[in-house]
Amino acid sequence: MFIGAAAASSPQVLIGRAQAQMASELPLPVGPLANIPDVEHKTLTAGAIDGVDDEVFAPPGFDVRCVAREGLNPLTGESAPFGYEWHLDPDGGAVYPAADDGGWVYVSNSEDTPGGVGALRFDADGNLIDAYSILEDTRNNCAGGQTPWGTWLSCEETTGGQVHECDPFGSDATAVRKPALGSFPHEAVAIDPIHHACYMTEDGGNQRFWRFVSDESDLSDDNGVTRMGLESGTLQVLSIQGFEDGGYPEAADARSPQPVTWETVDIDTSGRVLFPTFQNDETTQGTRFAGGEGIWYYEIPEALRQTPAGGSVPTRGVMFFATKGDNRVWAYDIENQLIEIIYDNDNMQMETGFDQVDNVVVSPSGDVLVAEDGALMRLVVVVPNGQAKLLMQITKGGSEITGPAFTPDGSRLYFSSQRGPSGADGSGTGGATFEITIPEEYRTAPVASTPDGETPDTDRPPTGSAGALTAATVAGAGIAALANRALRPADE
């Protein structure tokens, strides 16, 4: 959702040093993008747009091109009133590898009414070879989430919003609505493939952090990957200890890992939640979050796993998510059921703090990236409990950065300017989609010689609503399944 509209005239800086951190923090590794140099002025290598070509900043060696503009056919760059045109207000996105030629597909939501999802098909050399729709006639498709079995979950951010499962290589005819995931203003989702759970953020001012846990009957085998049907299971909300029943934690309350529990929520047959989350009193359930935004699952490499203070096993799977109303980035340690704020403006000394954090993505090498909803229009690398780094900024303002997603090898990053210049002459404000190339030296994952402790036993049984879930497949199998499917600028 776009809120800020004031134009930014020059790159805004994320500088300074972090204040003293709490002694107890989740042991989260840092990826190579934490070491990027300062940004510099960029000229688009393809798809130059008047009014934007001189407003893009990224580090040296990171090339930027425009790959699609609203109202134009992405292949021809021309209007196609009787053919396919790139959609209005591009938002959340993801990338899927193609097995037949080594290429990939980037999918992008349309946060409009009617909304939907568009797809851009690239070959192995990064050439755009096709563009098409995979979901139509929905409402305000904001963000969503990628599944390990190769589908895209598109979220409607509206009252009574639903989640729709789409095939990136298919069409609108193959999309399926999933009411069991609840009917509320969905923002984004992420799948925990180890424990068969779908985590969800809810947009708004006083919302909840959700998960759907599949029953055994909801699971099936899909080319060696356990697939969640997302139709039979339990819907739950998270409660941070001491902040149950609509409680709201201040930043200082969660800068070190805090224990959580999960409370089951009842829904009707249409997915409507049978309690109003906006009533934050004793009738509600769960901890209150200030506007849930992007979310992404990351599995820490085995050699880098460590046991956190307050935990019993090494941290393995982590859900990173953002809350816009208070500009926080959170990390939830699934195995240890601990949650922590890993970034917030109040705890970091910077000249220009986060401006409405929104979409979240984690690179294949473990870098956590956040896109901003506000007018500063930045893509920022979040260093857990450390200093953020500016990766990209479009200083034109009047829009927001959306849909960041990496190719599986981490060599390319896609994103959109939701209200960026559109149309043949760039005079429109319907949105544009871009690609950044990532140099190889910033794609190498961190390594460690020995892990701290044993890999957690994912076959242990649940221990109540707050306990571990049933065992499943490893996250790496999901990537194989996808492949099997047809801040400071340098002086100018």
Across the structure, where does each feature detected by a protein language model lie?
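A cross-kingdom C-terminal cell-surface attachment/processing module
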Residues: 467-488
